[in-house]
């Protein structure tokens, strides 16, 4: 099974036109171990980030009452699914609140400088395009499966018994056995040894 895509949501939630995209990203250390977690908010022109370091993330988890090994990504995914993400912008800073869990989690974000934000926004755009393309392929495959006719299964081996003849066509009905020529009517299955003869009407 493919791993889950990084969660994201649009803000504000609800039927209003979206103005921001909020997503998370896990960072990897050189040894391949998960080294951190960051939240991002963008309006497609500017980018805000939590800019966590391993130490600042550990301090934040301790303040939230979370263990050092606990991943915040599932909490963010659940908040996105429940539309429980709130954003507040203040000049070059932003605050993000995740509710809907045992306790609300609040994060402070700083504006990312343009040269550093550009490659991240490019990666986000390409990643979203790939996800849309993948979803369209799955949808097309599901629609093709739904409209294609289902083939009735056929028996694997040869048919051992022939169907009974149709009584309406003059054939024998079910359970009627054909009599072979010369077969005895008294003892079915035995042929008469004496040839059948006619009646002589000329005898007196």
Curated annotation (Swiss-Prot):
- PTM annotation: Phosphorylation may inhibit interaction with the DNA-bound XRCC5/Ku80 and XRCC6/Ku70 heterodimer (Ku complex).
Classification lineage: Eukaryota, Metazoa, Chordata, Craniata, Vertebrata
Q: Is Phosphoprotein one of the keywords UniProt gives this record?
A: yes
The reported effect of residue 134 to A is: Does not affect interaction with the DNA-bound XRCC5/Ku80 and XRCC6/Ku70 heterodimer
Family of the protein in this entry: Belongs to the XRCC4-XLF family. PAXX subfamily.
Record text on subunit structure and interactions: Homodimer. Interacts with the DNA-bound XRCC5/Ku80 and XRCC6/Ku70 heterodimer (Ku complex); the interaction is direct. Associated component of the non-homologous end joining (NHEJ) complex, composed of the core proteins PRKDC, LIG4, XRCC4, XRCC6/Ku70, XRCC5/Ku86 and NHEJ1/XLF. Interacts with POLL (DNA polymerase lambda); promoting POLL recruitment to double-strand breaks (DSBs) and stimulation of the end-filling activity of POLL.
By its UniProt entry, which PANTHER family does this protein fall under? PROTEIN PAXX
Entry GO CC: cytoplasm; nonhomologous end joining complex; nucleoplasm; nucleus; site of double-strand break
Mediates interaction with XRCC5/Ku80 and XRCC6/Ku70 and association with the non-homologous end joining core complex as annotated region, ranges: 171-204
Instruction: State the protein's purpose.
Output: Non-essential DNA repair protein involved in DNA non-homologous end joining (NHEJ); participates in double-strand break (DSB) repair and V(D)J recombination. May act as a scaffold required for accumulation of the Ku heterodimer, composed of XRCC5/Ku80 and XRCC6/Ku70, at double-strand break sites and promote the assembly and/or stability of the NHEJ machinery. Involved in NHEJ by promoting the ligation of blunt-ended DNA ends. Together with NHEJ1/XLF, collaborates with DNA polymerase lambda (POLL) to promote joining of non-cohesive DNA ends.
Please provide an example of a Pfam family that matches this protein in its UniProt record: PAXX
- Which residues in this protein are found as Phosphothreonine? 145
Limits of the PISA domain: 37-79
The places in or outside the cell where this protein is found are: Nucleus; Chromosome; Cytoplasm
UniProt gene name: PAXX
Q: Where is this region: Disordered?
A: 143-204
What is the designated name of this protein?
Protein PAXX
Q: Per the record, what about its domains? A: The N-terminus (residues 1-113) forms a head domain that is structurally related to those of XRCC4, XLF/NHEJ1, and SASS6.
Is the keyword DNA repair assigned to this protein? yes
Which residues are modified to Phosphoserine?
A: 134, 148, 152
Keyword terms: Chromosome, Cytoplasm, DNA damage, DNA repair, Nucleus, Phosphoprotein
Motif XLM: which ranges?
A: 190-204
The biological process GO terms on file are: DNA damage response; double-strand break repair via nonhomologous end joining
């Amino acid at each position: 099974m493919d791993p889950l895509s990084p969660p994201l949501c649009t803000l504000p939630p609800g039927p209003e036109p979206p103005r921001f995209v909020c997503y998370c990203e896990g960072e990897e250390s050189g040894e391949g171990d998960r080294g951190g977690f960051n939240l991002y908010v963008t309006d497609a022109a500017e980018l805000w980030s939590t800019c966590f370091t391993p130490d600042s993330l550990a301090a934040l988890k301790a303040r939230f009452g979370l263990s050092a090994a606990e991943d915040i990504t599932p909490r963010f995914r659940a908040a996105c699914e429940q539309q429980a993400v709130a954003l507040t912008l203040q000049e070059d800073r932003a605050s993000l609140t995740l509710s809907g869990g045992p306790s609300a989690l609040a994060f402070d974000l700083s504006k990312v400088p343009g040269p550093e934000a550009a490659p991240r926004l490019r990666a986000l755009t390409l990643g979203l395009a790939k996800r849309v393309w993948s979803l369209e392929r799955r949808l097309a495959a599901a629609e093709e499966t739904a409209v294609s006719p289902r083939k009735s299964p056929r028996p694997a081996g040869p048919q051992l018994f022939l169907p009974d003849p149709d009584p309406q066509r003059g054939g024998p009905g079910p359970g009627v056995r054909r009599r072979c020529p010369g077969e005895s009517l008294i003892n079915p299955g035995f042929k008469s040894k004496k040839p059948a003869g006619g009646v002589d009407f000329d005898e007196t």
